[in-house]
Amino acid sequence: MIDHRILEILVCPLTKDKLQYNKDTNELISQKAKLAFPIRDGIPIMLIDEARKLEP
């Protein structure tokens, strides 16, 4: 789970768009960039190299 206040602040490092939290995968999703950023030990990992590419 991630604090909703963090979601209001964080943006995709590539597109600068807002992110969506996926509770099933515990990831922050950038729909525009088609990337999923992992959350490890409660810390969002906002590195593009660490993001998982989403299927089109």
From Swiss-Prot:
InterPro entries: Trm112-like
Disulfide bonds: none
Domain of life: Bacteria
GO cellular component: cytosol
HAMAP family membership: UPF0434
Family recorded in the similarity comment: Belongs to the UPF0434 family.
Protein name per Swiss-Prot or TrEMBL: UPF0434 protein Ecaj_0131
